[in-house]
Swiss-Prot record:
Subcellular localization: Cell membrane
Domain of life: Eukaryota
Annotated residues for binding of ATP: 472-479, 1139-1146
Family to which this protein belongs: Belongs to the ABC transporter superfamily. ABCB family. Multidrug resistance exporter (TC 3.A.1.201) subfamily.
Protein name per the record: ABC multidrug transporter mdr1
Domain ABC transmembrane type-1: 112-402, 780-1069
GO CC aspect terms: membrane; plasma membrane
Keywords of this entry: ATP-binding, Cell membrane, Glycoprotein, Membrane, Nucleotide-binding, Repeat, Transmembrane, Transmembrane helix, Transport
Induction statement: Expression is induced upon voriconazole treatment. Expression is up-regulated in sreA deficiency strains, probably in response to accumulation of toxic compounds. Expression is up-regulated during biofilm growth. Expression is increased in clinical azole-resistant isolates.
Keyword Transport set for record: yes
Ranges where the ABC transporter domain occurs: 437-682, 1104-1342
Length: 1349
């Protein structure tokens, strides 16, 4: 291999080149961040092993502060520039109109037509005041006898017809505007969702290192819903209210400008109250949204690793962590709602004062003979309607401010220019390339940990068509090589070259399409096996081949990866859905599909980041042969902890501390006896010793040997008999039920709860009310003041009638007119103060109730989700994305029956009730005629409420599906990026949203028809009232006062009934949300952690027995996993389970942990059936260390303490378990020690470091039974040796069951059970099994590490 260029001059030159390349404007990557792939060394920001002793440790949970120069002080200027470019994010100023930035010409046209209709609908009501004034003058004329009856009747009928025409116009305009705004609201929100997802897929990995997948889900669901709320029907309602306000004031000024001007003065006070209040509301709304986003990330982390949380019983601790974010959000939410309540109270107070002022001044103008009563009434009525309509703008103001606050977050991501953009066309595309990769003086620092250098001055040549293997301890920078070749990050110094071209100058998407990556923890997408493998063809020359050709390529790749046979054994073959993140497959099966995906496109460059670590020895041997074959003729970079897999590599590079320690072939390095030799020694299965053991055992009694064979055969026979028994049961069941279902699917189908429970409205109201039981005092205060506030309008109608009758007094009584006017004006002012106090107190009380309801509902829903057993999470509808989205969206919707909505409904109900009673008391004839229309109004409102609830039910599932899909893609962003699947992901998401949009349009058209009817009926009601009341007045049955009391009461009452219906969407959403919650809370899992049932164990010996256990996964009832398993473990024994992928080893562990219960047979511990034991008590004696370690956001200490219930663990205990897990020295080398934050999903640590933290957590429980599901598969040889020694020590005195693919780790087991197809085919010690030369012997030979000759 040529010596790498050295010397200062060449380094300066390459850094200079890099500067030029990286400073070219706007290049970008796809993101490589909070990927559930739990990157090991990738953003192994734990390569902290090399942290400078004085290096200030950063809080990795938070974003790096780019203005904090101390973080970058040790770096050169161009290095700072490279790091800052990868983290930089613009702060975006968002106004309401920027919510419309994606509107097309068609959208704008619809919005304009809808706006014109909304304005026209708003103008109708003030025009009604002109007719009102005209009729009032006629009423005065007929009362005083100055107008003949026939003239009065003609004027009355003409004006009443005008009312009818106005009603028809109102119906048409309201309908058009409602449909238009709801349609464009949904359409534009869809575009925002699509653009946001596209922007997320464009981001570089460093951006994801600080962003959780849960936050993305929250933004794409809850936050876009807030935007939709802000640009849908509420815009129409606001424009209507505003048009009413403007038109009313124009009418008032035209009729009599002096009086109008005096009344307008109070509007200034109104505007000041609204403006001041809105500023604070926006501020608090933003803070509340941020807190919920952080909570969403916690929820996503926990739900996606539910098996771990269940095994350790950490549900309560993790729920408390989630609740701290909820409490923070509640604090800001209450402040926001209190300000809103006071703002509305202030507005009503000012309005009532306005009437008092207008009436008082109007009386002076009437006495001065400047105006008549009709003009004063038109002006006052216009000002009254105008001011009230301005009041209707306020509640919608909250929706607009929330929408703008949510958009600020979303647009800042959309507007961020990623420095590594997979969509960009910039950069060269090479027509032909060989595949020579060279690292030249490369220095690398992860942007989210600027104080740690993870790679220093690495020069390495990886020739075309050759295999280069990277080995070394965890955190030595091996996976960083992969990250740099894939251009997930920008190096801060030196160059990475492909055939002599700096890869920074090449087109990013093209580059990634030439490379295939298989990582240690493979991510599959929730679709069929076929589609998963087909993803490997995206962007390649095969992408647009015929369907048959693509199927042929996929099947060939599966054969090469040794996956074809197990796929064909599945009932649906290649069309089998793998479930979320591939959970329905075993680790080895997932890995083989990931390998097939990588090789299907015949790539020039293959990156294997521990590609076979999850495979059993047999699969590994075959797959390794396939990979060796696949590697022929292409550049291959292999990272391996299992050294047997890289013996044949052309060049082996041993890395330590971010530098190259040595390189050469296997034989050369073994002869050199350096770093590599030590690693090999640690892992070698010493065959010489085996040979000796064989000789020593050769003189064993032959009978014993025979006996062993018989035992094996007996076991096989008995297990086949028991399987026949189950088959017999199944046949009987089939005869009985007449279906082709197996007995197990019959058993399993019972376990799936009822999909759609029907709950009555009363049940749901009681259910929601229970959340607010502790706030009963606040509720009563809120309700009391809602009643008082509701009495404001009927009182005002009474005062209004008094005012009109006072103004209608003849000239001879002007002295009385002035005296009465003064008194009634003062009354208006008093009612105004009462309204301010009532609404402020009512707003505050309900704010507290509403926010606490949301917090409790979220908290309890989260706890209910964590209560469910594992089969609940296996179901497709309960994916991490769907559940996270449910927590963020549906809880918000519950507030539709609390807070402001509930207060308003009670107020309007009081108004309607009081108005009817007063009207009936004063003039029953007219009151009854007016009241007859009210039920029609109510029916319209309830129908609309019903329609919206139906619409909500339909749309929810579609948006939940698309949200879940987006969450899955963003949480696996590294995989999406390496497959260049960005446009494919976006396309699928786009199609899901389009489908939903078409569905919802029909529903909107129907429900808007009913809403428009409810608005128009007000005018018909008024027309009827005026016609009948006028007739009574003409016949002198009623005085003006009696007419106006009845008329005003019912008019304002009917309007109030109309207001209730504008809350129908909120109530519809709340009803639907409540049904979802009730269903969740009612679903009692079979294995219930809340239950006190079952025997609680005081102690445990650790004797375990599986008796004839049959098992199938609930989501796969047709696929048997265990077929009559018999297995026994004595207390304190160390048992190992080995065998090929998918043979039931991990299932055995899952049954022991009671993640599931056996379908037939039983699992016994100390002779007790574990299904009869209390599940929490039982699990407290167990500890599980699984293949994919799970850490949560928080510090190393917090993660270790999750192993136990109590927090007061002594420092000595903590240090002891860390030393036992070989993690103590590493933790102490970190600047912040145990208080180091591990990042989202432990992303700041490498795979090996995460696994050792997980082992420390398991040991902290001091378990009686230790379950190791490939606990050391993520470790390099050196760590593995120490951790294995620690595990061996930890196993003493306790029962240990280990699933192992790496056989060197289980040589010393007391008994090794060899599994095949859900049964045990042989068992014995390592020596016995080697001597038997059976299945185990084959596995050992496959894994041998002898020299290559």
């Amino acid at each position: 291999m040529p010596a790498p260029e050295t010397g200062a001059s060449s380094r300066e030159k390459s850094l200079e080149d890099l500067q030029v390349a990286t400073l070219e404007k706007g290049r970008s990557t796809s993101s490589f961040g909070a990927d559930n792939e739990k990157p090991h060394d990738h953003h192994s920001l734990s390569d902290t092993i090399m942290a400078p002793p004085d290096g200030k440790q950063k809080d990795h949970g938070k974003a790096v502060d780019l203005n904090d120069d101390s973080l970058f002080a040790h770096l050169q200027e161009h290095e700072k520039e490279v790091l800052k470019r990868q983290l930089d994010a613009p702060s975006v100023k968002v106004s309401f109109f920027t919510l419309y930035r994606y509107a097309s010409r068609k959208d704008i046209l619809i919005i304009l037509v809808s706006a014109i209709c909304a304005i026209a609908a708003g103008a109708a009501l003030p025009l009604f005041t002109i007719l009102f004034g005209s009729l009032a003058s006629a009423f005065q004329g007929i009362s005083l006898g100055t107008m003949p009856y026939h003239e009065f009747y003609h004027k009355l009928t003409k004006n009443v017809l005008y009312f009818v025409y106005l009603g028809i116009a109102e119906f048409v305009t309201v309908y058009v505007s409602t449909v238009g705004f709801i349609y464009t609201g949904e359409h534009l929100t869809q575009k925002i969702r699509e653009n946001y997802l596209e922007a997320i897929l464009r981001q570089n990995m460093a951006y994801f290192d600080k962003l959780g997948a849960g936050e993305v889900t929250t933004r794409i669901t809850a936050d876009t819903n807030l935007i939709q709320d802000a640009i849908s029907e509420k815009v129409g309602l606001t424009l209507t209210a505003f048009a009413t306000f403007v038109t009313a004031f124009i009418v008032a000024y035209v009729k009599y400008w002096k009086l109008a001007l005096i009344c307008t003065s109070t509007i200034v006070a109104l505007v000041m109250v609204m403006g001041g209040g809105s500023r604070f509301i926006v501020k608090y709304s933003k803070k509340s949204i941020e807190s919920y986003g952080a909570g969403g990330t916690v929820a996503e982390e926990v739900i996606s690793s539910i098996r771990n949380a269940t095994a350790f019983g950490t549900q309560d601790k993790l729920a408390k962590q989630y609740e701290t974010h909820l409490a923070e959000a509640e604090k800001w939410g209450v402040k926001q709602q209190v300000i809103l309540g006071m703002m509305i109270g202030g507005m009503f107070g000012i309005m009532f004062s306005n009437y008092g002022l207008g009436f008082w001044m109007g009386s002076r103008f009437v006495v001065g003979k400047e105006v008549n009563v009709g003009q004063v009434l038109t002006v006052l009525m216009s000002i009254l309607i105008g001011s009230f309509s301005l009041g209707n703008v306020a509640p919608n103001g909250q929706a607009f401010t929330n929408g703008v606050a949510a958009a600020a977050k979303i647009y800042s991501t959309i507007d961020r220019r990623s420095p590594l953009d997979p969509y960009s066309d910039e950069g060269k595309v090479l027509d032909h390339f060989e595949g020579n990769i060279e690292f030249r003086n490369v220095k690398h620092i992860y942007p989210s940990r600027p104080e740690v250098t993870v790679m220093e001055d690495v020069s390495l040549s990886m020739p075309a068509g050759k295999t280069t293997a990277l080995v070394g301890p965890s955190g030595s920078g091996k996976s960083t090589v992969v990250g740099l070749v894939e251009r997930f990050y920008l190096p801060v110094g030196g160059q990475v070259l492909l055939d002599g071209h700096d890869i920074q100058t090449l087109n990013l998407r093209w580059l990634r399409q030439q490379i295939s990556l298989v990582s240690q923890e493979p991510v599959l997408f929730s679709t069929t096996i076929f589609r998963n493998i087909e993803h490997g063809l995206i962007g390649t020359k095969f992408e647009h081949e015929s369907k048959d050709k693509i199927r042929e390529l996929v099947e060939n790749a599966a054969r090469m990866a040794n996956a074809h046979d197990f796929i064909m054994a599945l009932p649906e073959g290649y069309d089998t859905n793998v479930g979320q993140r591939g959970f329905l497959l075993s680790g080895g099966q997932k890995q083989r599909i990931a390998i097939a995906r990588a090789i299907v496109s015949d790539p020039k460059i293959l990156l294997l980041d521990e590609a076979t670590s999850a495979l059993d020895t047999k699969s590994e041997g075959v797959v390794q042969a396939a990979l060796d074959k696949a590697a022929e003729g292409r550049t291959t970079i292999v990272i391996a902890h299992r050294l047997s897999t890289i013996k044949t590599a052309h060049n082996i590079v041993a890395m330590v501390g971010g530098k190259i320690a040595e390189q050469g072939t296997h034989d050369e390095l073994v002869d050199r006896k350096g770093t590599y030799y030590k690693l090999v020694e640690a892992q070698r299965i010493n065959e010489e010793k085996e040979a000796e053991a064989l000789e020593a055992d050769a003189d064993m009694d032959a009978d014993d040997f025979g006996q062993e064979g018989v035992t094996r055969i007996k076991t096989a026979v008995s297990s086949s008999n028991s399987l026949d028994a189950v088959d017999e049961k199944a046949r009987l069941e089939m005869k009985r039920t007449g279906t082709q279902k197996s007995v197990s699917s019959a058993v399993l189908s019972k376990k799936v709860p009822e999909q759609f429970e029907k709950y009555s409205l009363w049940t749901l109201v009681k259910f929601i009310g229970a959340f607010n039981r502790p706030e009963l005092g606040y509720m009563l205060i809120g309700l009391t003041f809602s009643f008082l506030a509701g009495g404001g309008q009927p009182t005002q109608a009474f005062l209004y009638a008094k005012a009109i009758s006072t103004l209608s007094l003849p000239e001879s009584m002007f002295h009385k007119l002035r005296h009465d006017a003064n008194f009634w004006s003062l009354m208006f002012f008093v009612v105004g103060i009462a309204q301010f106090i009532s609404l402020s107190i009512n707003g505050t009380a309900f704010a507290i109730c509403s926010e606490r309801l949301i917090r409790r509902a979220r908290s309890q829903a989260f706890r209910s989700i964590l209560r469910q057993d594992i089969s609940f999470f296996d179901r497709e509808e309960n994916s991490t994305g769907a559940l996270t989205s449910f927590l963020s969206t549906e809880t918000k919707n519950l507030s539709g029956v609390s807070g402001v909505t509930l207060g308003t409904i009670i107020m309007t109900s009081t108004t309607l009730g009081a108005a009817m009673i007063i009207a009936l008391a004063i003039g029953w004839k007219l009151a009854l005629v007016c009241i007859s229309v009210v039920p029609i109004l109510l029916a319209c409102g309830f129908l609309r409420f019903y329609m919206l609830a139906q619409f909500q039910q339909r749309s929810k599932s579609a948006y939940e599906g698309s949200a879940s899909y987006a969450c899955e893609a963003t949480s696996a962003i590294r995989t999406v990026a390496s497959l260049t699947r960005e446009q494919d992901v976006w396309g699928v998401y786009h199609d899901q949203l389009q489908k939903q949009g078409r569905k919802s349009l029909i529903s909107v058209l129907r429900s808007s028809l009913l809403y428009a009817s409810s608005q128009a009926l007000v005018f018909f009601c008024v027309a009827l009232g005026f016609w009948y009341g006028g007739t009574l007045l003409g016949h002198h049955e009623y005085s003006i006062f009696r007419f106006f009391v009845c008329f005003s009461e019912i008019l304002f009452g009917a309007q109030s009934a109309g207001t209730v219906f504008s809350f129908a969407p909120d109530m519809g959403k709340a009803k639907n949300a409540a049904a979802q919650f009730k269903k969740l809370f009612d679903s009692k899992p079979t294995i219930d952690i809340w239950s006190d049932e079952g025997e609680k164990l005081e102690s445990m010996e650790g004797e375990i027995e599986f008796r004839d256990v049959h098992f199938r996964y609930p989501t796969r009832p047709e696929q048997p996993v265990l077929r009559g398993l018999n297995l026994s473990v004595k207390p304190g024994q160390y048992i190992a389970l080995v065998g090929p992928s998918g043979c039931g080893k991990s299932t055995t562990i899952a049954l022991l942990e009671r993640f599931y219960d056996a379908l037939a047979g039983g699992v016994f511990v100390d002779g007790k059936d574990i299904t009869k034991l209390n599940v929490n008590s039982y699990r407290s004696f167990l500890s599980l260390v699984s293949q994919e370690p799970t850490l949560y956001q928080g510090t190393i200490k917090e993660n270790i303490l999750l192993g136990v219930d109590k927090d007061d663990v002594s420092e000595e205990t903590l240090i002891k378990v860390c030393k036992d897990a070989n993690i103590y020295d590493f933790v102490m080398s970190l600047p912040e020690g145990f208080d180091t934050v591990v990042g989202s999903k432990g992303g700041m640590l490498s795979g090996g470091q995460k696994q050792r933290v997980a082992i420390a957590r398991a040991l902290l429980r001091d378990p009686k039974v230790l379950l190791l599901d490939e606990a050391t598969s993520a470790l390099d040889s050196e760590s593995e040796k120490v951790v294995q020694a620690a595990l061996d020590a930890a196993a003493r005195g306790r029962t240990t069951i280990a699933v192992a693919h790496r056989l060197s780790t289980i040589q010393n087991a007391d008994i090794i059970y060899v599994f095949d197809q859900g049964k045990i085919v042989e068992s014995g010690t390592h020596h016995e099994l080697i001597r038997n030369k059976g299945r185990y012997y084959e596995l050992v030979n496959l894994q041998s590490l002898g020299k290559t000759h």
